[in-house]
């Protein structure tokens, strides 16, 4: 999908063309001040030349129109600054609506002309990517559940804090977990997930701890450890699963 072309657009049903110009406030102030002083300087210089050549009437007329132009320039500059401040407040309001998930109509974006069109386009793209990512996560979660039901090897899935996230069918035969916030240390007190993280970050290999419990690191796409697969197959199996509340 290609982004919309940066061109003027109609605002609502009023037929007004909206073109946004992005410029730093300091630069705009410099341009306005320089142009304002240029008007005054030009009028003053023309008045001086006219007086030197004995054209007093023409010189005074030029000076008068110079002051009128300077006054008009000042009023226009003030309007531009106030309008820019108003647009800034509207943009911050739009950002708050996006942050808190409020419903945003197309009219809110049209107020910003081409900039609003680009923001709306980027927002739609981000929402589409977010939806795709959610579907991918849901699919991976389903795949994880299917694999944990099929794998007979007793393996427990934990995060970097040692909290148990899931376990395979073989592990559930050995451990009954009632508390969903249970950590691996609750089941096997001799283990230390923090030490396992430290060692795995150095070696990038599985870490075996007391009792033959093996912490197998799972790496993310950027190479960081995201989870651990804890292999407890070397632990002696009991007739009744260990029940932990």
UniProtKB/Swiss-Prot annotation:
Bilayer-spanning residue ranges: 29-51, 61-83
Keywords: Cell membrane, Membrane, Transmembrane, Transmembrane helix
Membrane topology classification: Multi-pass membrane protein
GO cellular component, one term: plasma membrane
Keyword presence, Transmembrane helix: yes
Highest taxon listed in the record's lineage: Bacteria
Localization terms from the record: Cell membrane
This protein's name: Uncharacterized protein TP_0138
């Amino acid at each position: 999908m290609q982004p919309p072309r940066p061109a003027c657009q109609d605002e609502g049903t009023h037929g007004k063309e909206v073109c946004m110009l992005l410029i730093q406030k300091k630069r705009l102030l410099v341009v306005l001040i320089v142009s304002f002083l240029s008007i005054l300087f030009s009028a003053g210089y023309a008045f001086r030349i006219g007086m030197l050549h004995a054209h007093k009437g023409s010189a005074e007329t030029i000076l008068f129109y110079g002051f009128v132009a300077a006054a008009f320039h000042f009023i226009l500059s003030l309007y531009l600054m106030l309008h820019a401040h108003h647009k800034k407040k509207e943009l911050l309001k739009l950002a708050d609506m996006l942050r808190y998930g409020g419903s945003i109509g197309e009219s809110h974006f049209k107020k910003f002309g081409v900039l609003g069109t680009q923001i709306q386009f980027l927002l739609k793209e981000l929402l589409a990517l977010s939806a795709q990512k959610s579907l991918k996560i849901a699919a991976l979660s389903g795949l994880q559940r299917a694999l944990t039901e099929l794998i007979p090897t007793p393996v427990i899935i934990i995060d970097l804090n040692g909290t148990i996230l899931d376990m395979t069918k073989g592990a559930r035969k050995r451990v009954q977990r009632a508390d969903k916030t249970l950590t691996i240390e609750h089941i096997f007190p001799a283990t230390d997930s923090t030490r396992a993280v430290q060692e795995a970050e150095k070696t990038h290999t599985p870490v075996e701890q007391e009792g033959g419990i093996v912490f197998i690191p799972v790496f993310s796409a950027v190479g960081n450890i995201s989870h651990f697969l804890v292999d407890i197959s070397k632990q002696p199996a009991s007739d009744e699963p260990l029940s932990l509340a």
